[in-house]
Regions:
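Flexible hinge motifs at transmembrane-helix junctions and intramembrane kinks/re-entrant loops
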Residues: 44-49, 60-78, 262-269, 291-297, ...
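Alpha-helical membrane-protein architecture signal
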Residues: 56, 106, 158, 162, ...
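Transmembrane alpha-helix interface/packing and boundary motifs in multi-pass membrane proteins
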Residues: 63-71, 162-172, 208-219, 311-313
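Membrane-embedded alpha-helical segments and adjacent helix-loop junctions characteristic
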Residues: 43, 74, 78-194, 352-353, ...
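Helical membrane-embedded segments and adjacent short helical loop/helix-boundary regions
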Residues: 20-31, 49-55, 67-76, 102, ...
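Generic alpha-helical transmembrane segments of integral inner-membrane proteins
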Residues: 29-37, 59-63, 81, 85, ...
């Protein structure tokens, strides 16, 4: 059974902060300049003052993200603070003679943290940690990779298939890549492949690209899908079930993955076509995993049960996706039948990504409400 260690996290926390680059400083200054210019422009008659200011905040955020001027979690706090101030001192749409107020503006921007999509992202982080703690993700990968052969193209295909399997159980691309990346690095090292080689780049880049398309195919694979489902329910009065989504999106996703499979190999040409002795190494890696542990079995049962509830939602029962996911996470921590405790999970969760998702969803909500 593999375990997740917080040693790296501790070392990173203890290490001195790296200096900022000139490009980052320019990006930060540019973001504020663009924000200021937009705020100084006259407000169009068809746009509210709040909507005008939020366009400025959106431009500010995009520049921060494009230039990596600050980390994503830090950008989330900046977006939240700017929204609370700029929107708070804007006229209240319901009573134009009064200001909206910073408290009301803050409630709007942090509403993203209570959205079903946000909860799904947070839950995905816990599922990812559970996968890595028990080693179930590595077992799945080894079962697939030891069956596809030793050609680089086959190993690449195995990585893509592993990503597909994880997409059914881990509802976030970020969390899935957190599972896949260490596995791919382990495969590269155990098979004697150079980390800086094109083969290693192909496996890593290809896994991420394919995962993007699996996001589209499976409703619970990404938070933005639930945002879209919620929008269709409120704006179009249309409900889309998990199965309906899969049926509609699968053809497109599969075609795009096939295109990406061949295109990435053409753009990142491997140095060699087959790994000599790779079958022996893969068999050895699979054997090292050993028999399935009790925690792996528990996680597998919970994951299959969760997938079944997702797939039958709206058909056999009326429990929403977010509630079923929270139930599964609760089972992870339940005494005796659980697979981890909070002390283990807390340092291994990517809280920064959760903060970023919450602020991003909140920003989208505010943009919709400030017309």
């Amino acid at each position: 059974m593999s375990t997740v260690s917080s040693t790296n996290t501790t070392q990173q926390a203890a290490a001195p902060p790296k200096g900022r680059t000139t490009a980052q400083n320019i990006g930060l200054i540019l973001a504020f300049i663009v924000l200021g210019v937009i705020l100084l422009l006259p407000t169009p008659e068809t746009l509210s003052t709040g909507g005008h200011r939020m366009i400025g905040v959106l431009a500010f955020a995009i520049i921060l993200w494009m230039t990596s001027a600050v980390s994503y979690p830090v950008s989330a706090t900046m977006i939240t603070a700017l929204t609370a101030l700029l929107l708070g001192f804007s006229p209240n749409p319901e009573a134009p003679a009064k200001m909206l107020g910073t408290a009301n503006a803050l409630m709007l921007i942090i509403s993203g943290f209570s959205s079903p999509a946000m909860i799904l992202v947070g839950a995905a982080m816990f599922i990812s940690v559970a996968m890595r703690k028990t080693g179930l993700d590595r077992r799945i990968a080894m079962l697939v990779l030891s069956s596809v052969g030793t050609k680089v193209s086959r190993i690449y295909l195995g990585v893509i298939i592993t990503g597909l399997i994880l997409a059914f159980f881990v509802p976030s691309a970020t969390a899935r890549i957190a599972c896949l990346a260490p596995i791919i690095i382990g495969i590269v090292e155990n098979l004697g492949i150079e980390r800086k080689s094109r083969v290693a780049a192909l496996l890593m880049v290809g896994a991420v690209q394919a995962d993007t398309f699996w996001n589209i195919m499976i409703q619970t694979a990404a938070a933005q899908n639930l945002v879209a489902v919620g929008f269709m329910q409120t704006q179009m009065n249309t409900s889309v079930s998990w199965i309906d989504w899969l049926t509609a999106a699968a053809p497109f996703s599969i075609i795009m993955v096939i295109i990406a499979y061949f295109l990435t190999q053409a753009l990142i040409k491997p140095e060699f076509k087959e790994l000599v002795g790779g079958d022996v190494q893969l068999a050895k890696m699979r054997k090292e995993i050993g028999p399935m542990s009790t925690d792996e079995k528990k996680l597998l049962c919970i994951s299959i049960g969760l997938l079944a509830l997702w797939a039958t939602g709206g058909k056999l029962h009326s429990i929403d996706t977010t509630t079923t996911t929270i139930i599964a996470i609760a089972l992870f921590f339940f005494p005796k039948i659980g697979i981890m405790d909070w002390k283990f999970a807390q340092p291994n969760i990517d809280w920064g990504s959760i903060v970023m998702f919450g602020a991003g969803i909140g920003l989208g909500t505010v943009l919709l409400k400030t017309k």
